Amino acid sequence: MRLHSVLAVATAVGCAVAHDPVVQVPMCPWNAVINFDKTVPDQKPFPQTTIRLCYNSKTLSLKFEAKDEKYFYFDPSQKINDDIWKYEVMEAFISTGHADPSTYLEFEVSPNNVTYQAFVYNPSKNRTDGAPFDHAFISNPIADGITSKTSLAQTQGKWTSNVQIPLALFNVDTPQGSKWRMNFFRTVTSKETYPDQILGAWNSPDKASFHITSFFRKIVFV
């Protein structure tokens, strides 16, 4: 363990199990570190991806690092809450409590710092065909306190995004000791392969869908 870092390395194993350890996220400036490098769902090699998490009294801080990046592929015409997920993004799915959620925040950021943020209504908890599945978009994220600062290091094959998400979105007034379910994802595509994507996840679902909430991992703020 190095200064300001609590290691929480988690290479996805293809299925969530009940005895998965609860990941502890500390107050800033310390952070928990999550890594993944396997595809969804077949667990083949995937570009190394890191997320660093910490919190303060008002905010969840996420630092996304997309490593081994070759393409930096995005649509420059897209704006807030457009379908940036069709290109290259890093994603966080977040809910409070330790039960499998039926509603949760879906946050995405692209290499050109465009964001997508919506509360997802998914009562089947696995996006079952024919079941309700809807999004309530956050239309003015910056005014609401959702911010991102993204930088590209193309010679190093990496892009990084520092994200702040207000805890008030989740009605959390006392964050220390609060319980959460989260999962983190990344999509990879290129001009040559679009619209096909390679998918990666912290805790990989058993099929190519990010919206299976039993695979969200348990987290507690300490």
Swiss-Prot record:
Name the CDD domains for this protein.
CBM9_like_3
Major subcellular site = secreted
Q: Tell me which UniProt keywords the record has, alphabetically.
A: Glycoprotein, Secreted, Signal
Q: Which domain of life is it from?
A: Eukaryota
What are the annotated glycosylation sites? Answer: 113, 126
Q: Which GO terms describe its cellular component?
A: extracellular region
Protein location: Secreted
Leader peptide range in chain numbering: 1-18
Q: Does the keyword Disulfide bond apply?
A: no
Name recorded for this polypeptide:
Extracellular protein ARB_03106
Q: Which organism is it from?
A: Arthroderma benhamiae (strain ATCC MYA-4681 / CBS 112371)
